[in-house]
Amino acid sequence: ISNKRVGIDIEEISKKPLKLSSKFISKENHLNLTKEKATLIWCCKEAIFKWHQRGNINFVNDIKISSFFIQKKGKILAEFNKSNYTLHYQKINTHFLVYVCK
């Protein structure tokens, strides 16, 4: 058991996050957005939200995801509440698994 907090999310890659992307991705980050990328960004923001364990988060403005290239597994950097986070992800068949531990 870890003495650190953990946030984890798993999502099926689908068109739904792409359709809802304006609710969690800023307008300037919509360029070249695919269903895979939108799903992975949603997963990252959900993992941070679950790590935070409190409400009142604006997914567009409060959680910033750095640029990334999708691979089978990797790390994505994010900023939340003026702190940096490293999110670990893995593509498992048609799903993304993302977790943060801090």
Regions found by a protein language model. Give the residues of each.
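Core catalytic alpha/beta fold that binds nucleotide/phospho-ligands
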Residues: 1-102
